[in-house]
Amino acid sequence: MGDLGAGLLQAGLLLLLLAAVHVPLGDFLARTFAGTRHLRLERGIYRVLRVDADADTRWPTYALSVLGFSTVSILFLYAFLRLQGFLPLSLGRPGMEPTQAWNTAVSFVGNTNWQSYAGESTLGHLVQMAGLTVQNFLSAAVGLAVAVALVRGLVARGTGTIGNFWVDLTRGTLRVLLPLAFAGAVLLLLTGVVQNFTGATTYPTLAGGSQTILGGPIASQEAVKELGTNGGGFFNANSAHPFENPNAVSNLLEVFLILVIPFSLPRAFGTLVGDHRQGLAVLSVMGTIFGASLALTTWAETHAGGSVPQAAGAAMEGKETRFGEWASALFATATTATSTGAVNSAHDSYTAAGGGVVLLNLVMGEVTPGGVGSGLYGMLVLAVITVFVAGLMVGRTPEYLGKRIGQREITCAALYVLVTPAVLLTGTAVALSDAATRSALLNTGSHGLTEMLYAFASAANNNGSAFAGLSANTPFYNTALGLAIWLGRFLPMVLVLALAGAFAAQRTAAETAGTLPTRSPTFAGMHLAVVVVVSALTFFPALALGPIAEALTGAQS
């Protein structure tokens, strides 16, 4: 089978798998968060935390719970990283220095997993398991909870309440993420992903030398790393390392784990609001942009200009030969269209066009399909903006699912779409304005700008992948990127919860002849246009100076 046939087979199998599970998983997610019964284990957790599981809260209480829990998580993980040298299973590794510990703690609690360190040489097994892997579960559950709270706000009929964060967090972790991650870890083990507790072992090589190989609890971390759209690797090479991703089967499974919850959440949304066509409209926008991104990235990497790529048949620099350009492009699209950030190839080595597309995925806000929870609430915020714009165009009162889009609602939505660009572009400008911080770039010109832009786009959008041409382990970048992660994660969450509270305080208006149908193909098309215009064109000047300029320069040469 040729490369084209193998690539199409992978994409087709992925599509079939996602189509097969998105309905049952989406319905399961809806039942999980709509139910009123608590499991015995859950009731025990609520008693320990002294939480009234039956209390319904307003959005300020919900937001304070999110921020309080995340702050405690950051402090706990920071202490864990600083004190590693005194902990068991540390493999003799010392604690992290303060700015790197801050960056790592915020990164994993913020579902970003930006790594300015090499995991195999910096962290021991206990920190990997009880520190980073635990946050892989909890950060994903926080995003899931916020998305569900927004949907509750749309469904509520004047109650002003959006649920209980502690109940949503517990259910998302115990009922959704833990079972799915366990199943994913078992399947990854069957494909050859490593799971043990060995340290560094030295083996003789066929060439007569020696090589030191590190084992560890990799499969258990790998499953939730992908399922929770986290992305932080056990090894510095991430999913390009054969212990994390040994073959084509494991690669396809990891891409499936990345996409399965984000693409199932629109179905859960449709079930919760009582109209599956609403979920299909959101899903169609996600799927259309994802498919276009995959096609463009694959084309760019398989039709690269220049004598060397043409002689090799594709741009294979920075890619594993066991995957090739098709599987690498599929993984790169999935990991940047969500908030995952895991990599099985070097994005910095992609063609200018291919690197530009994966960067575009980041700056579009990762809503196609986006991260666990964050993708859905990002799409719903953009749907609110779409309704508002459509209402202005045709002279109708803007309403979404029977909820009026007034000044308060559109203010929350507008601030939501402004936060990430402000953080991203400000951070990039500050880093480029000083010669000392510019010296961390390994490239100059348009590619150097792309590397810097990618770093802050990855941080502000909670992705975590990188163009490796930036030497980011410095006090400035550890601090600045950590701040970008915090602002890019939690400010949008607070605005989403404020929007949910505004909707929850309203009674649902009856649908009339003047109501804009938000489940029609026409609205879905306009929704798609708003995603592209609002999210992508905001960054066009920066993209024009970076990957677009590099691509045009390469075409001329």
From Swiss-Prot:
Residue stretches spanning the membrane: 4-24, 61-81, 131-151, 174-194, 253-273, 280-300, 375-395, 412-432, 483-503, 528-548
Instruction: Name the Pfam families for this protein.
Output: KdpA (PF03814)
As for subcellular location, the record says: Cell membrane
Gene Ontology cellular component list: plasma membrane
UniProt keyword Membrane present? yes
Q: Tell me, in one coarse class, where this protein mainly resides.
A: membrane
Keywords, comma-separated and alphabetical: Cell membrane, Ion transport, Membrane, Potassium, Potassium transport, Transmembrane, Transmembrane helix, Transport
What biological function has been recorded for the protein in this entry?
Part of the high-affinity ATP-driven potassium transport (or Kdp) system, which catalyzes the hydrolysis of ATP coupled with the electrogenic transport of potassium into the cytoplasm. This subunit binds the extracellular potassium ions and delivers the ions to the membrane domain of KdpB through an intramembrane tunnel.
Q: What is this protein called?
A: Potassium-transporting ATPase potassium-binding subunit
Q: Which organism is it from?
A: Kineococcus radiotolerans (strain ATCC BAA-149 / DSM 14245 / SRS30216)
Gene giving rise to this polypeptide: kdpA
